[in-house]
Amino acid sequence: SGDLLDAGVNRSPSGYLNNPAEERSKYRYNVDKEMTLVKFVDDEFGPVGSFNWFATHGTSMSRTNSLISGDNKGAAARFMEDWAEQNGLPKQTGHANSDDFGSLHLPRRVSTIIPEPDEITDDLMQLASSYKASGGRILASSNITRRIRNTQKNNAKFVSAFCQSNCGDVSPNVLGAFCIDTNLPCDFNHSTCNGKNELCYGRGPGYPNEFESTRIIGNRQFLKAADLFNSASEELQGKVDYRHTYLDFSQLEVSVSTSTGGQQVVKTCPAAMGFSFAAGTTDGPGAFDFKQGDDKGNPFWRLVGGILKKPGKEQVECQAPKPILLDTGEMKEPYDWAPAILPIQIIRIGQLVILSVPGEFTTMAGRRLRDAVKNVLISGSNGEFNSNTHVVLAGLTNTYSQYVTTFEEYQVQRYEGASTLYGPHTLSAYIQEFQKLATAMVANKEIPATNILPPDMLDKQIGLLPGVILDSTPPGVHFGDVSSDVAANSDFRKGSTVNATFHSACPRNDLLTDGTFALVERLNGDNWIPVYDDDDWSLRFKWSRPSKLSPESFATLEWTIPEDAVPGVYRLRHFGASKPLIGSIEHFTGTSRAFAVR
């Protein structure tokens, strides 16, 4: 494990400051900076993967982004896997440095690691000009599957996972939150600008380019993970074990300490969302006149929420000081609006203990849970667990139930507190029940069986997205034909963007899960070889239907040429699947005109 200092900031510092000063003084930062990594090594194949846990939200991309994205966590995982593939699954130890993995630059695809020609010649330009757009053509389903899987031929056996932790109040927008109209910092307590939450946005390190912010935060996590991977020396030894149970969080009795030092039994509540939930966060502001830090509410929105379900006196008192906007735990039509039955789980791999929680714990909430479980493990064992036991919190696991704050943070009613579903004692309930799991694990006992199980609501799901009726092209045009091609006799320098638009069809006809909608191919002798696909950071696939009532649609492929791309002749290729009004889905492909890369 090691600290990563520049990939997350606290987006609700006023809530964090409501925690006891004595508790806050134990920690240097108001977010967790530690990344914990597990390196997996096979006796035969060597390193085959890594899992790491680090707390930062996957919100580098804004809510206006319309492209499918794994955000900074997904980017980090891809960078790590490309790096491992490029380095031949390195077995060396010692700290990685910038020379090992390109500093802040992205790792190269394996397919690009070949000797580079010294320069682009006129002959190469002439060669590129001889390859025109292929025109669209139909492919048999079996052929497209085989063809697309061939584009993945360089996939490594290495798998890297960048797991979430107690990220509830942690933002990757590390430059801070500013008003978009004045460029001044947002109000500290309410994250508003002249009373409006809609104007307050967090800024990532690549501001104003959200793609660059995503790349930078992903790359910072990758660099730290690569460093920990290369320096990993502590071997996990001991038992592999777990404990798992389901609990009804809408009515748990919890024993908590009182201000006089005694104990008091309290209860959790049916789920409810507070007014500040609708205010959103600096990573994605809400709308209307909502604001964070609202522990009063207002009559108009109480009336609106009450039309759906007016909370009773007991629920209001249980959730206090949260003013209830949506009484989701008591709204049952057409099915439950919020979960009540949740899973909790402890997994042990030697001296590593993973706490699987079904929500987003804030920084201090996660710290309290980790410490409570570790204390039980150490005090209840005969040295099997000790100060060297690593306890990590795996957030958003097994199911999702919004946020979990400390009791003190809950009083402030920032977004995270308003989204803590089961009332002010939610964290205490988690701590109490995880301590029971830890006690059972130490004693080598099973968890008492219960009849509590989450409801199966698969047959109640409502789908509002209409199916694809048909796809079509203009007369004389085929699926896969180029609508807007790369300019003739083009050559591009690294860092430039090349794009081509194709007549296409709805991607929902076939998600091409094992394949790709987009390829960049390079000429190698007489053959075109795939070098980048739509999972690569440099290549984007954008589908659009200019008229909602038209069956015609287009796919634009945008390739920003990486700095380490091999000079040569390239082209863009699109894959898709079209649906006729009558008949079966047909797969198609088409290519752009060739172009040269210097």
Predicted feature locations:
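Non-catalytic substrate/cofactor recognition surfaces at enzyme active-site rims
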Residues: 1-598
